[in-house]
Amino acid sequence: MHIYRTGQDITVLNDHLEAPGIGFLPANAFVLHAREPVVVDTGLGLPDRDFVRALASVIDPADIRWIWLTHPDRDHTGGLFDLLDAAPLARVVTTFLGVGILSTERPLPLDRVYLLNPGQSLDVGDRRLHAFRPPLYDSPATVGFYDDRTRTCFTSDCFGAPLPTADLARTGDARDIPADELRAAQLLWANVDSPWVHIVNTGQYLQTVRSIQHLDPDVILSTHLPPAIGLTTQLLDTLAQAPGADPFTGPDQQALEQMLAAFQPAAPA
């Protein structure tokens, strides 16, 4: 796991996954060093990852007060229950639907839950975190937030981009990605993660894009993109094009078999 600071108040815990035929997808969690510290998502649920151990290199888990779960997919909840054990004062910020989805894997203690809906806000001591639903998402439980002190939007899956190399997936600045490559990757991800974008009312969809524009964030932090500093206009312009981008169709069984055959060692002569 690649761990680094972005700005004064935020630590990025960066991981990534390779999706064959798509690219290297960043998988970020964050620590917001507020007066009441907030962990945003809890990493991948793979057996060789130890999210709590990595997190402990950044902050004592006993000091954590909030775990903001942007949605309950496994690339966001990998360390959740271990972190609840290690951080006895922390409460999980999620929605009613989020609790329901999580409970299909393991019961979530309701005294450790704080239900928050889009449009509401959370006081974390020295700032308020304003909850919103991002324009693009793959889960009805998705809730991002805007930190009015650092002028940062935490957007969950929205604005994600599978990248051509692992090094780019690890970079600490989305400006390292050429603009045309970033645009193409974000449009691909929009159609992988939110295929419904092709069937919604375009005018109403663009209103949700403008809602981010009205916040005018300096930084956009997506789970699946390196930190985007000073790129808000560029990223919103790309998001506005998502309904007209090519729909994504994944490999079928024949393509999978061809892919697996390519991995087989050549027969001896």
Please describe what each predicted stretch is:
Residues D15-G21, G43-G45, W68-H71, L129-P135, ...:
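Short, flexible loop segments at the rims of nucleotide/cofactor-binding pockets, characterized by
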Residues I229-A269:
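C-terminal regulatory/interaction regions
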Residues P47-V93:
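Active-site metal-binding motif and surrounding structural segment of the metallo-beta-lactamase
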Residues M1-L55, G144-D147, R151-T155:
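Conserved beta-strand hairpin/beta-sheet module of binuclear metal-dependent hydrolase folds
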Residues L44-G45, R74, G160, P227:
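Short, glycine/acidic-enriched loop or turn micro-motifs at the edges of active sites
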Residues V40-T42, I64-P72, V92-F96, C153-S156, ...:
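Active-site neighborhood of phospho(di)ester-bond hydrolases with catalytic His/Asp-centered motifs
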Residues R5, V93-S222, P227-T232, Q241-P243:
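Metallo-beta-lactamase
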